[in-house]
């Protein structure tokens, strides 16, 4: 089964992202707006308890942190994807790095660019038109992230939360 690790932003930020995703993201119905921390990976059922334990340890080792969205950007020419760019933060980078150490495999395909996808698989014209329009808008949002989620993929391709992990030491 496929698993992944992500963080889900607050409802106001999800609503803002979804206002674009419903038009520009074919994965809109498969998963809510999120920041991918660990791309999909396969696990056998017997491996799950040790992975859950490791994600819990990682989460406990990172304190809650600010998530700041500050502009719209694209991965063009690598892919025709539109996203809300998230300002880098050491805790966010630490989560990503820790989720790419043993027992997890390293992501060799892309470097980590914190973002929230709002459109993908767009034609060049769609990308250009929307990027130009969205860059004129002031996109500014900040919130505190205090949890991450381990997700699993259902047979229909959608993703659902397996377990939520609070960040930082429990009091």
From Swiss-Prot:
- Give start-end ranges for motif HXTX 1: 34-37
Motif HXTX 2 per UniProt: ranges:
115-118
Q: Where is the active site?
A: 34, 115
EC main class here is: hydrolase
Record keywords? Hydrolase
Q: Which portions of this protein are annotated as coiled-coil regions?
A: none
Matching InterPro entries, A to Z? 2H_phosphoesterase_YjcG-like, Cyclic_Pdiesterase, YjcG
Q: What is its EC number?
A: 3.1.-.-
Has UniProt tagged this entry with the keyword Hydrolase? yes
Annotated Gene Ontology MF terms?
A: hydrolase activity, acting on ester bonds
The residues that cross the membrane are none
Task: Give the family from UniProt.
Answer: Belongs to the 2H phosphoesterase superfamily. YjcG family.
Q: What name appears for this protein in its UniProt entry?
A: Putative phosphoesterase BH1439
């Amino acid at each position: 089964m496929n698993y992944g690790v992500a963080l889900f932003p607050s409802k106001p930020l999800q609503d803002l992202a979804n206002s674009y995703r419903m038009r520009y993201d074919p994965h809109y119905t498969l998963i809510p707006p999120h920041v991918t921390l660990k791309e999909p990976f396969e696990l056998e059922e017997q491996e799950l308890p040790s992975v859950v334990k490791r994600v819990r340890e990682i989460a406990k080792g990172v304190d809650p942190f600010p998530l700041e969205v500050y502009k719209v950007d694209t991965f063009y020419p690598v892919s025709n994807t539109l996203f809300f760019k998230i300002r880098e933060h050491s805790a966010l980078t630490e989560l990503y790095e820790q989720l790419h150490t043993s027992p997890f495999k390293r992501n060799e395909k892309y470097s980590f660019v914190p973002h929230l996808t709002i459109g993908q698989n767009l034609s060049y014209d769609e990308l250009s038109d929307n990027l130009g329009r969205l860059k004129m808008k002031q996109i500014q949002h900040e919130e505190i992230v205090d949890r991450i989620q381990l997700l699993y993929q259902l047979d229909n391709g959608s993703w659902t939360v397996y377990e939520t992990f609070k960040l930082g030491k429990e009091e």
